[in-house]
UniProtKB/Swiss-Prot annotation:
Effect of residue 197 to A: Abolished ability to cleave lipid-conjugated ATG8 family proteins
Impact reported for residue 216 to D: Slightly reduced ability to cleave lipid-conjugated ATG8 family proteins
Functional note: Cysteine protease effector that inhibits host cell autophagy by targeting lipid-conjugated ATG8 family proteins on pre-autophagosomal structures. Specifically hydrolyzes the amide bond between the C-terminal glycine residue and an adjacent aromatic residue in ATG8 proteins conjugated to phosphatidylethanolamine (PE), producing an ATG8 protein that cannot be reconjugated by host ATG7 and ATG3. Mechanistically, Ravz interacts with ATG8 proteins conjugated to PE via its LIR motifs, extracts them from the membrane of autophagosomes and integrates the PE part into its own lipid-binding site.
Subcellular location, record wording: Secreted; Host cytoplasmic vesicle membrane
Main localization, broad class: secreted
Outcome (variant: residue 306 to A): Reduced binding to phosphatidylinositol 3-monophosphate (PI3P)
Keyword annotations: Host cytoplasmic vesicle, Host membrane, Hydrolase, Membrane, Protease, Secreted, Thiol protease, Virulence
Name of the protein: Cysteine protease RavZ
Positions of region (Alpha-3 helix): 211-217
Catalytic site positions: 176, 197, 258
Length: 502
């Protein structure tokens, strides 16, 4: 999708053009869908706002404020690499609008994490002749509220606020997700701002690119400093040095994962503040994709965005009560529905059918599983025939990206397989309806059995044949012949084991 980017667009692409890249390349980045209004906005209805599964999303496809807020649910998930429960507890009161409050378990540090908001935007002018830029009214208001809170605070505090910075002339760059933190020391009455940025600054490539493109500014540091100074103007606070802690990640022009790096850094800042240690992030200029945002981090992020169906009210309870949000069966159903909807819109890739399953096969299997899960959710019994059909579709359901979706939910629902998830709800038939029909002539066609034949079959000598056993065999034949005679009168007797005689 091509179009002009504005401060209201929700795209968070994480790169300024490298040396040699043309400004028009910005159009290659797709705009993401608009955000829902988040808590703290009067328009929000917490009871109905939902962040649904996005089963086709990947970590490099970009972040928006809705996705970032959804990821906050991982902070008190004990199975997540982003778990904060060992470092902080939640504050019962909510002294700051739009922020979650935490108390360090190891010192008196208080930490306030603001919810992501699409209106937290700052713009910078790239040329030296213009003023520094602008800060969105809502972001400016949050800075004033932080200043007001600190005027009454007696404990050290750290404020964490994700925001988007962008050039006022969008042809000179792109929107970029960064993280603003402000540390407050009540003894010295000093506020110290820091911006964490996933684009390496002060590198040779960055400086050379800015020089040739005539960029006097490439960040919002100057306008943010001015805004913070304005917020504390009527106080006796001092402002510490504004610092931008920048680090690199790989393939910045093609990876839209600055939002994922921001989320990773939120966790790092909270844990470090709670422990009273320095925030440890990679240095500027280093390629750090796999060492900082590890494969486990990426998996947790993608699984949350792709497979979970979470409401704003759920995330609020997790962050205000410090509890894990268990995966529900209903989330499994919604994720499958999203997968089915997207898969039905895709064209058939026949070249892959030799090694995988066709589009039709996947959709059929998904529809079957959705129906079964809905029955389980409604506490209805699953028929034996439904179960048999599911067993036949298991391999298809566990294939490729669909298999990852299914495996995620099975693991979180505590089931080793689809069969074990469904089996407790299956009602098996108590009676056998399908009889085996045998012709009566075949039933009574009993060959003569001689001692010699039995002996030869057994591989024993004729003299060792048990005469009593031979007599029993003959008696059986006699009894069967008697039954045959009775049948001539028209009497038909069913035999044991569900076998009946014609």
């Amino acid at each position: 999708m091509k179009g002009k980017l504005t401060g209201k667009d929700k795209l968070i692409v994480d790169e300024f053009e490298e040396l040699g890249e043309q400004e028009s390349d910005i159009d290659e980045f797709d705009l993401l869908e608009g955000d829902e209004k988040l808590p703290g906005d009067s328009e929000l209805d917490k009871t109905t706002s939902i962040y649904p599964p996005e089963t086709s999303w990947e970590v490099n496809k970009g972040m928006n404020s809705s996705r970032l807020h959804k990821l906050y649910s991982l902070f008190f998930d004990k199975s997540s690499a982003f778990y904060l429960g060992d470092d902080v507890s939640v504050l019962e009161d909510k002294p700051l609008t739009g922020a979650y409050g935490f108390q360090s378990k190891k010192n008196d540090q208080q930490i306030f994490l603001f919810r992501p908001d699409s209106d937290y935007v700052a713009g910078y002018h790239v040329d030296a002749k213009s003023d520094a830029g602008w800060v969105n009214d809502k972001l400016d208001r949050r800075l004033s509220e932080i200043s007001e809170f600190c005027s009454k605070a007696t404990q050290p505090a750290t404020f964490i606020l994700p925001f988007v910075e962008m050039p006022t002339d969008i042809t000179k760059g792109v929107q970029h997700q960064v993280l603003l933190t402000i540390s407050y020391d009540p003894k010295s009455k000093q506020l110290t701002p820091t911006v964490y940025d996933s684009i390496g600054r002060d590198t040779y490539s960055e400086s050379l690119s800015s020089y040739f493109k005539g960029k006097y500014r490439t960040t919002c540091d100057e306008i943010l400093t001015q805004s913070i100074e304005k917020a504390i103007k009527s106080t006796d606070f001092t402002l510490g040095k504004f610092t931008r802690a920048a680090y690199n990640h790989q393939n910045r022009l093609t990876e839209g994962n600055c939002g994922s790096y921001t989320f990773r850094t939120i966790k790092e800042v909270i844990s470090s503040s709670a422990q009273g240690t320095e925030v440890k992030i990679p240095g500027s200029g280093y390629i750090t994709s796999n060492s900082y945002l590890t494969s486990q981090h990426v998996q947790d992020i993608e699984s949350c965005i792709k497979y979970r169906n979470l409401g704003v009210v759920d995330i609020e309870s997790a962050l205000t009560e410090g509890k894990t949000l268990p995966v529900q069966l209903s989330e499994f159903i919604v994720a499958l529905e999203d997968y089915g909807k997207l898969r039905s819109q895709q064209s058939e890739k026949s070249m892959l059918n030799f090694i995988g399953y066709s589009k039709t096969a996947k959709l059929t299997a998904v529809e079957l599983l959705i129906g079964i899960l809905n029955d389980i959710k409604g506490k209805n019994e699953i028929s034996e025939s439904q179960y048999d059909k599911l067993v036949k579709e298991v391999d298809c359901l566990m294939d490729s990206s669909l298999g990852k979706l299914v495996q995620f939910h099975l693991k979180n629902l505590g089931a080793e397989s689809l069969q074990k998830l469904v089996l407790p709800c299956v009602k098996f038939d108590d009676t056998i309806d399908d009889f085996v029909t045998i012709e009566k002539d075949e039933l009574f066609d009993v060959p003569d059995i001689t001692g010699e034949e039995l002996a030869s079959k057994k591989g024993i000598e004729q003299g060792a044949l048990d005469k009593e056993a031979l007599l029993k065999q003959k008696q059986i034949k006699t009894d069967l012949l008697d039954l045959r005679e009775e049948d001539k009168t028209g009497l038909k007797k069913p035999l044991h084991g569900g076998i009946k005689v014609k």
